[in-house]
Amino acid sequence: MPKPFIQNKNKQVLATFTASYRDRHGRETGVRDKVISEGEEDYSGEDNFSGEEEYEEYDSDDSEHDEYIQQESAKKEVDDLSTIGFKKDGFDYSKYMRPIGGGVFIPAIWDVNELKNKKNGIVELVKNSEPAPFMFGLEEISKDYKKDVKDLEVDEDIKEALVVDDEEDDFEELDDDFILQANGGTLDGLQDEVDETINKFNNFRIKNKAYDFIDDEEDYNGDGEYYEGEDDDDDYYEDDEEYYKNLKNKSGNNNNNKDDGRKVQDEVLEAQFEIALEQYEDEDIGELEPEETLGTCNVNNFEDVFDEFIDDYNKNHEPLMVQIQTLKKNNNFIALTEKEKEIILKRDWNKEVLVEVSDHENEENEDDKWDCETILTTYTNLENHPKLLREEKKIKLSRKTGMPIGVIPTKQKGDDGNSDNEEEDEEEDEKSVNLGVSRKNETKESKKLRKQQLKDDRKNKRELKKDLKVAFKKEEIKQTSIIKDQKTNSSVAVRY
């Protein structure tokens, strides 16, 4: 083998890649420089290709595409407005912008690794950058402003299309073959293509009968084939009425076969419909079980029930006036009408009124003929409790408490266990005299006794009032505890 030009020991691998084509302002420069850098040291020569193989794999179209991209990128103009956020539409946005000055320009960072290499982060970039010049940004905007009238003019064709006249004659009616006219073709030139599409469509229908799109089966001859007329080409673009007339004339006797087929379909549908109706007429619905008869019953056993129902029905269906009269007899609070008042005033009250008495009432009166002794003998000792007859005492209420006197025993402090009767206390209250008022011809000793007695009475009242408060508090605590117990017992559920 010949000795290689470069030995493996001394060779150095280089890799080429495209550098970033954005400047420090983030604008596209349109220039892509090839940068050469050192490759990896551990690179092995297994993937080396000869020059002929590379040339075979590289297509000429790729080279042309690369050249086209380079040319287009060179033609691109630098759009300063896009970097600021405005459209390049010919409008002078600098009129409405405030000039910038005295600030610090922070450059756009396109590579994050570049920011990581900085120790102080973005602060270091701001220090190294230049301050923003006065009127920065406005010059770039005003530079792209189109001041020439020629550049802003609209084409005459667009103006004519936008102009709309009020006259109806100005609107042109489109022909049926306006698509062909727009493409610059004629019917004669496209007739072959139309025939091919028709034949393809007919073949598709023959293979797939389920996708037959023609109404009423006008082209079907009954033998599984579709016929094509002789003059289909001439009549294809004529009016619809003439087209359908020709098809009906060409069908001929094939309509009989179609009628027979339709009759068979109608009979099948009717049979299916009758079967569905029979299913709905069945009384067995779902999974319900049929009713079972438990046996026969005599109607005479229910005569009392029927009679009661008839009586209630007659009572509830009486005339309205009769119902009102019965209500007024039973209820004295219902007001009378003026007519009823006039009838009552005109009535002769001295006249005797005969009242008919039914046999049923006489039967009830016979039961009342029993003596008191015989009736008392019918009662047992459980119901009959003999005792002395006494006059019932009237219940007297206390003025202080409002409770009945003699029902609740009360004890007073200072007594030796012998409580006075409530009636005596009430009598003493009635006999009590106002001790706070001085009397005529009162001596000093009597006055002193009166004041001492008044003090004792007030002291006793204060003690009673205090005892009453304590009793109420105890009862309140007791009732609250009872209510809590009831709530807890009601909320607890026990399962066995």
Curated annotation (Swiss-Prot):
Keywords: Coiled coil. Residues 38-65, 417-430 have a biased composition (Acidic residues). The keyword Amino-acid biosynthesis does not apply. Residues 439-474 form a coiled coil. Residues 28-66, 217-236, 400-462 are annotated as: Disordered. It comes from the Eukaryota. InterPro entries: Ltv1 (IPR007307). GO terms for biological process: ribosomal small subunit biogenesis; ribosomal small subunit export from nucleus. Residues 28-37, 453-462 have a biased composition (Basic and acidic residues). One of its GO terms (cellular component) is preribosome, small subunit precursor. Belongs to the LTV1 family. This is Protein LTV1 homolog. The lineage of its organism: Eukaryota, Amoebozoa, Evosea, Eumycetozoa, Dictyostelia.
